[in-house]
C-alpha cells in the first residue's frame, strides 16, 4: 500500500467529511439487466466485471459469432461495492462457467460464487493465475522522513492495513492494469472455454492475447513518454500498482489508503497526502470514474496548488462514446489521461 509522508498538522474535519490452478474453484446497486455479449455448445458463460466481459466476449465472438457472454456488472459499476440482484445471483448459480477476477475484488459476489461452485459450475478466478503482486509494491519509500512525527498515526494505519488485508487480501486484484497479464488471462479463458467448446476457443484466446499485446506496446509508448522524474501517481485508492510496476511509475499516495473504495481515510491520512502532493509537486490526483471525486477535489484544494483531479476508468469500461468502450480502448484512454496530466 502506498506509503507517504505525514504532515505535522491535521487536515480540517470538513475535508474528511467530504470524504496455477484452473480449479473447479467455482465463486452501488446493481442492475437487473445484465449485459450479454450462449457460449460453447449450450454452455452458459458469465463474466463478473465489464473488463472481463470485454475480453471473454472478444474470444467468444471470434470462436462462435452466435455465442454470447453475460456480463453481470453494468458499465460504471464499482466492483468493490457491487451488489447483485436476485436475477443476477440466479445467473451465477446456473452458469456452467463463471469468469471472475477474484482476490477479493468482487466481495459482494462471494456467496453467489460459492453457491455456483457447490452446484458444479467452474469458477475461473483470473487474478490468482497471472502472478499477482502484493499491495504497495511500488509505493513511495520516502515516508520515513516523517515517521517519528506520527508514531500514533502509524499505529492506527497499521491496524487499518491489517483490517484491509483481511477484507481484501494481501495481493492486489487490479491485474488488468498490466496488459501483459491480461494477455495471459485471455489465453487462460480461451483454454478453459476449449474444454467444452473445442479448439477454436483456445485459438481465439491466443488471437485476443496477441491483440492485447499489440495494444500494450502503444500504451507503453504513451506512458514511457512521461519523463522519469514526473512518473509519480496519487490515486483515489490503491488501484494502479500493476501499472506502476509495468511502466516504471511510483505510487506517492492515495486518498483512501486501501485497496478498496469501501475504506475511509482519517484526518491524519489526508494531512499526510496533502504534504506529499506539495512536497513532490504532484500535478494531478487520479480519481475513479465509478465513484464521486468530491474527496479528491477537497484534497487538491487543500494543497493550495494547481492540482487537477483526473477521472480514470479504473474498475469499469466507459459508456458508448467515452473512448473506453472495451478493454483495449479503456487502457489507451487511461494512458493518455495519465500522460497528459503529468506533463502539463
Show where each model-derived region lies.
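Extracytoplasmic metal-acquisition and chelation regions
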Residues: 2-15, 21-344
Amino acid at each position: 500500500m502506498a506509503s507517504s509522508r505525514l504532515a505535522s498538522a491535521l487536515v480540517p474535519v470538513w475535508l474528511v467529511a467530504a470524504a496455477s490452478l484452473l480449479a473447479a474453484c467455482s465463486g452501488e446497486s446493481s442492475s437487473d439487466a445484465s449485459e450479454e455479449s450462449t457460449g460453447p455448445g449450450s454452455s452458459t458463460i458469465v463474466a463478473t466485471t465489464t473488463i472481463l466481459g470485454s475480453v471473454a466476449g472478444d474470444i467468444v465472438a471470434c470462436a462462435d459469432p452466435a455465442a454470447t457472454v453475460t456480463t453481470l456488472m453494468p458499465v460504471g459499476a464499482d466492483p468493490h461495492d457491487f451488489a447483485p440482484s436476485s436475477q443476477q445471483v440466479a445467473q451465477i448459480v446456473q452458469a456452467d462457467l463463471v469468469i471472475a477476477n477474484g482476490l477479493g475484488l468482487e466481495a459482494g459476489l462471494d456467496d453467489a460464487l460459492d453457491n455456483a461452485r457447490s452446484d458444479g459450475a467452474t469458477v475461473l478466478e483470473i487474478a490468482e493465475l497471472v502472478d499477482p503482486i502484493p499491495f504497495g509494491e511500488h509505493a513511495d519509500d520516502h515516508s520515513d522522513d516523517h515517521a517519528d512525527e506520527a508514531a500514533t498515526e502509524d499505529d492506527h494505519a497499521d491496524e487499518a492495513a491489517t483490517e484491509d488485508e483481511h477484507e481484501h487480501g494481501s495481493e492486489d486484484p487490479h491485474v488488468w492494469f498490466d496488459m501483459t497479464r491480461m494477455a495471459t488471462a485471455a489465453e487462460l479463458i480461451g483454454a478453459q472455454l476449449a474444454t467444452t467448446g473445442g479448439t477454436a476457443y483456445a485459438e481465439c484466446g491466443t488471437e485476443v492475447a496477441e491483440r492485447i499485446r499489440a495494444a500494450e506496446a502503444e500504451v507503453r509508448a504513451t506512458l514511457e513518454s512521461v519523463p522519469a522524474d514526473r512518473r509519480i501517481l496519487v490515486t483515489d485508492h490503491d488501484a494502479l500498482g500493476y501499472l506502476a510496476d509495468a511502466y516504471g511509475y511510483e505510487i506517492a499516495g492515495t486518498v483512501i489508503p486501501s485497496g478498496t473504495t469501501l475504506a475511509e481515510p482519517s484526518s491524519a491520512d489526508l494531512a499526510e497526502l496533502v504534504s506529499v502532493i506539495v512536497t513532490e509537486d504532484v500535478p494531478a490526483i487520479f480519481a475513479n470514474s465509478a465513484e464521486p471525486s468530491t474527496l479528491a477535489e477537497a484534497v487538491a484544494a487543500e494543497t493550495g496548488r494547481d492540482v487537477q483531479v483526473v477521472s480514470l476508468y479504473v474498475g469499469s469500461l466507459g459508456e458508448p462514446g467515452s473512448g473506453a468502450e472495451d478493454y483495449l480502448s479503456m487502457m489507451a484512454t487511461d494512458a493518455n489521461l495519465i500522460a497528459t496530466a503529468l506533463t502539463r
